[in-house]
């Protein structure tokens, strides 16, 4: 479990290779080493074909796909953003890893989600828990939906390629 600070940073999903995954898993327990791999290798390469920027919409996306909070979700929808294996334990950065099997399940879980379903979930988020007064509105929902569509496309492609996935965000 990790601490989420209000007014989250910009999140990015990266569809990574088996070699990159092995490096990250070998570094688990050493937050500095994990960050070096993420920042100096994965982020630095910025492989546009295998990433999805979520800006700050990742927060609302996760809440819509889970119980409305930032707790780790369960099952494929809960894995989409903050689920999976936590590779970084500090409060300054989040790195969550999904296996290719989990990526496939997330892709399948996201496929049928409609804009109406997402809107209903979005407006059930507790404004006090969201931490940004006045942000739960139609304009922010449209922003969230636009990024969600990119996330869904990302998972479809990552699943088709059998890739691992990490979600990263700095706090």
How would you name each of these model-derived features?
Residues 1-146, 150-153, 157:
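Acidic (Asp/Glu-rich) sequence patches and key acidic residues
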Residues 166-167:
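Cysteine-clustered segments with highest specificity for TGF-beta superfamily mature ligands
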